[in-house]
Design a protein with these regions (language model features):
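Asp-based phosphoryl-transfer active-site loop
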Residues: 1-8
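A metal-dependent, Asp-based hydrolase signature
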Residues: 16-19, 29-90
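Substrate-recognition element of Asp-dependent hydrolases with the DxDx(T/V) motif
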Residues: 84-139, 147-150, 273-280
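Gly/Ser/Thr-rich loops at beta-strand to alpha-helix junctions
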Residues: 125-129, 185-186, 252, 275-284, ...
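Conserved Lys-Pro-Asp/Glu-containing loop-to-beta segment of HAD-superfamily phosphomonoesterases
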Residues: 159-186
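Acidic, divalent-metal-coordinating active-site segment for phosphoryl/phosphodiester hydrolysis
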Residues: 184-199
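Flexible inter-domain linker/hinge segments
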Residues: 206-258
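Long, charge-dense
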Residues: 297-335
Length: 336
């Protein structure tokens, strides 16, 4: 029903890290090593919380987000409970930012509702059902009268198959008329089939669950967002032809990144007005106006000949660039 705008689910923690490192509250409330290592701290806290759950109570390693952050508080007692609550709130807000309605999942959901089917949402997730409802609502779903089950709350998962049994009992579901839709082959498809539940594999959605190579990428968030454009679910956002796909996956991110940098430079250097020169800067000008027109830096599209523009910038060019422009079969002087 929803997808994320990042390549790996855990890249959300890197996005959180950027906020921890720039907002004054977190800078003053968190020690530098916590901010610098937050993605790994958050991942390891979840591992510890699940292990401790099994050690203390047996059963499945299903936990809630509050229990995950309890582990962070244990290992970093210098953090106040109030600060930890703020970080939990930040994680939920970041989920709202990266989540969006999946078009295929949305169509199935709306069709089921219009056909009068009883819809039940089941998630293997550490977020409580109330937060899951909040996230789905922020993505545009009306789920006010729809039951939502969280493995963290129920302490049983689809991964073990036991969450299906809980839903069947609580909702009085007839197995013969139950159709379960999910993207995880083991948890959503194989385990459901073992119980006699009809299934539909949501193969239109995918994620990479590998580990981020933070030491290789200078901008882990930018890398994650760009790689997310290669996932199946984003095909709904571009036409199915090679040129549109190349524009969406390659040149779109490239130009948007460049214009984002340019807009930031204009602010840093307190530029009053930016001139975008015809015709090479036409697309850059359009992108700037579309996404950065509220940056309070005036801009104008200026018609100018390439020849005069070359002369202005020639001092910054390397020799091979000058030779490329003015060399050729016919001898040319700089004047020509």
């Amino acid at each position: 029903m929803v997808s994320r705008r990042v390549y790996r689910p855990r890249d959300l923690f890197s996005l959180m890290q950027s906020t921890l490192a720039t907002e004054n509250f977190f800078i003053s409330a968190c020690e530098i090593d916590i901010i610098d290592n937050f993605p790994e701290i958050r991942v390891q806290a979840e591992v510890s919380a699940r292990e401790n759950r099994v050690r203390r109570f047996g059963g499945e390693p299903e936990v809630l987000i509050s229990e995950i952050y309890d582990e962070i508080l244990k290992k970093h007692p210098q953090l106040s409970p109030a600060t930890v609550e703020k970080i939990i709130d930040l994680e939920i807000q970041m989920e709202k930012i990266v989540l969006y309605k999946n078009s295929r999942g949305s169509c199935l959901f709306e069709k089921a509702i219009s056909d009068g089917c009883k819809v039940i949402l089941i998630s293997d997730m550490y977020l409580p059902s109330a937060i899951l409802k909040e996230l789905l609502t922020s993505c545009g779903y009306d789920i006010s009268n729809i039951p939502v089950y969280s493995s963290g709350e129920e302490r049983h998962s689809k991964n073990s198959g036991k969450l299906f049994s809980i839903v069947k009992k609580n909702e009085n579901v007839d197995i013969a008329s139950w159709m379960h839709v999910g993207d995880n082959v083991h948890a959503d498809i194989l385990n459901a089939k073992k119980l006699g539940i009809n299934t539909l594999h949501a193969d239109w959605s995918e994620y990479n669950h590998g580990v981020s190579n933070h030491w290789k990428a200078k901008d882990i968030i930018g890398e994650s967002i760009c790689k997310a454009l290669l996932l199946k679910q984003v095909s709904a956002f571009h036409q199915n032809d090679p040129l549109n796909e190349i524009g969406f996956k390659v040149f779109g991110p490239l130009l948007l990144g460049y214009v984002s940098w340019l807009a930031n430079q204009l602010k840093i250097h307190k530029i009053d007005k930016a001139l975008f020169l015809a015709r090479d800067a036409h697309l850059i000008y359009k992108i700037y106006n579309e996404y950065f027109s509220e940056e309070h830096v005036k801009c104008e599209y200026l018609y100018i000949s390439r020849a005069s523009a070359y002369m202005v910038g020639m001092t910054d060019w390397p020799m091979h660039r000058i030779w490329h422009l003015f060399g050729g079969k016919n001898k040319k002087s700089i004047k020509k």
